[in-house]
């Protein structure tokens, strides 16, 4: 079982390393999301380009990077604790992608996707938390941090066997937001609906 867990973790990392924000931006003739806005290759920053459809596609594909390996591992009978580590591997791939010089995103959508096979209730609580904070503040980063802070509590109440890996994953997500936290404290963090002047992508 341990060998299978390592193999699935490797697959999860490689799948997570696919930077959908960069690829979809190229397909839609949008600028590289690493070069404008928050410089984060994720759905929120793609949304700042003004292309909502592209942002939605990126969000869904990033979620699938977490859902697919964790669901396959669950189907293969891998124990709960190891399922959590496979989800972490997918998020590490998103954060430090092998194919894109290790310049990745924050891992929020991928983490959410990884939680869905573990329980729709946990995923739903995280989505609701994220939406509430976003609607009240307008900051996607603050919404992600709020959801990450509460996710271990939700997990402990609903699926306690997953608490440790979920807590580890949430710590990783919060650490990845250290620049956002600094900008929030300084009042320089862009809101999710703020648009940035963009240059056309050069082929």
Curated annotation (Swiss-Prot):
Q: Name one GO molecular function term.
A: acyl-phosphate glycerol-3-phosphate acyltransferase activity
Q: Identify which top EC class this enzyme belongs to.
A: transferase
Give the Pfam families listed for this entry: G3P_acyltransf
Please give, as recorded in its UniProt entry, the membrane topology of this protein.
Multi-pass membrane protein
Localization per record: Cell inner membrane
The record's principal subcellular location, in a coarse class, is membrane
Q: Its annotated pathway?
A: Lipid metabolism; phospholipid metabolism
Q: Which reactions does this protein catalyse?
A: an acyl phosphate + sn-glycerol 3-phosphate = a 1-acyl-sn-glycero-3-phosphate + phosphate
- Its GO biological process terms? phospholipid biosynthetic process
Q: List the disulfide bonds.
A: none
Query: Which InterPro entries does the annotation name?
Result: G3P_acylTferase_PlsY
UniProtKB keywords: Cell inner membrane, Cell membrane, Lipid biosynthesis, Lipid metabolism, Membrane, Phospholipid biosynthesis, Phospholipid metabolism, Transferase, Transmembrane, Transmembrane helix
Q: Does the keyword Repressor apply?
A: no
A GO CC term attached to the entry:
plasma membrane
Give the transmembrane region(s). 4-24, 68-88, 104-124, 125-145
Which Enzyme Commission number(s) are on file for it?
Answer: 2.3.1.275
Indicate the segments annotated as coiled coil, or none if absent: none
* Described function: Catalyzes the transfer of an acyl group from acyl-phosphate (acyl-PO(4)) to glycerol-3-phosphate (G3P) to form lysophosphatidic acid (LPA). This enzyme utilizes acyl-phosphate as fatty acyl donor, but not acyl-CoA or acyl-ACP.
| Family statement | Belongs to the PlsY family.
Query: Subunit notes for this chain?
Result: Probably interacts with PlsX.
Under the heading PANTHER family, the entry gives:
GLYCEROL-3-PHOSPHATE ACYLTRANSFERASE-RELATED, INNER MEMBRANE PROTEIN YGIH
Instruction: Give the protein name, as stated in the record.
Output: Glycerol-3-phosphate acyltransferase
The source organism is: Tolumonas auensis (strain DSM 9187 / NBRC 110442 / TA 4)
Gene transcribed to yield this protein: plsY
